[in-house]
């Protein structure tokens, strides 16, 4: 009778090139381009993109890794990621807010009863910038928010130089934001999702 304890594990030897073929085959089974809500498992990839995009410019990040995990656990439906062959290349993370204007608390809180989606961060991987991906993702995200009956508007804060970019999507400046980060100051912008639906119908997107 064969004693299984005497069996020794042996390495599996594949023909030359087989492993490369299998890896390629696995990649080819992934969708070339996919949009989906993020999960806590996507947090590390999102933070790496965000850190590279923001630290070099402003010295800080809108969200740090534990905060990303926090929001993707509480409200993953308020996020959207763009994946190319399974790799995250751009994303937006949001949460619900229940006051008219943003406050320091809004940076870390999710208010389930709120009607306002607070966009914490939009970031694009460095190799995919200057290709219009941020614009496409933001259109899709606003459309995604519009499909959620509880969400009536979107709000964000940005530096003055980015205000014209967001105005193209129906956002309107409502004045200086009460939030400051170090020496950085921001403009607060709001967008009615009803207004966005009109713009989208007339944009050809």
Curated annotation (Swiss-Prot):
cAMP-dependent phosphorylation on both N-terminal Thr-29 and C-terminal Ser-203 regulates AANAT activity by promoting interaction with 14-3-3 proteins. The keyword DNA-binding does not apply. Induction: Exhibits night/day variations with a drastically increased expression at night in the pineal gland. It is an enzyme of class 2 (transferase). GO terms for cellular component: cytosol; perinuclear region of cytoplasm. Substrate binds at residues 122, 157. It is found in: Cytoplasm. InterPro entries: Acyl_CoA_acyltransferase, GNAT_dom, SNAT-like. One of its GO terms (molecular function) is arylamine N-acetyltransferase activity. Acetyl-CoA binds at residues 122-124, 130-135, 166-168. Pathway: Aromatic compound metabolism; melatonin biosynthesis; melatonin from serotonin: step 1/2. The modification Phosphoserine is found at residue 203. Its EC number is 2.3.1.87. Highly expressed in pineal gland at night. Expression in the retina has not been confirmed. Extrapineal expression could be strain-specific. Pineal melatonin synthesis is severely compromised in most inbred strains of mice. In C57BL/6, a polymorphism activates a cryptic splice site causing the production of an alternative form containing a premature stop codon. The predicted resulting protein would lack the putative catalytic and acetyl-CoA binding domains and therefore would be inactive. Belongs to the acetyltransferase family. AANAT subfamily. This is Serotonin N-acetyltransferase. The gene is Aanat.
């Amino acid at each position: 009778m064969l004693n299984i304890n005497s069996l020794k594990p042996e390495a599996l030897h594949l023909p030359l090139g087989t492993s490369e073929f299998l890896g390629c085959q696995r990649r080819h089974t992934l969708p070339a381009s996919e949009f989906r809500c993020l999960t806590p498992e996507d947090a590390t990839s999102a933070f790496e993109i965000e850190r590279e995009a923001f630290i070099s410019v402003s010295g800080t990040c809108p969200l740090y890794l534990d905060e990303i995990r926090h929001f993707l656990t509480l409200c993953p439906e308020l996020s959207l990621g763009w994946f190319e062959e399974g790799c995250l290349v751009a994303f937006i993370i949001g949460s619900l807010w229940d006051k008219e204007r943003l406050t320091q608390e809004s940076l870390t809180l999710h208010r389930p009863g709120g009607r306002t989606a607070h966009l914490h961060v939009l970031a694009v991987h460095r190799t995919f910038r200057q290709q219009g991906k941020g614009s496409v993702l933001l259109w899709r995200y606003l459309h995604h928010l519009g499909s959620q009956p509880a969400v009536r508007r979107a709000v964000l804060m940005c530096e003055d130089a980015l205000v014209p970019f967001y105005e193209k999507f129906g956002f309107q400046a409502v004045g200086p934001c009460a939030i400051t980060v170090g020496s950085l100051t921001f403009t607060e912008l709001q967008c009615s999702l009803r207004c966005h639906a009109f713009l989208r119908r007339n944009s050809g997107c």
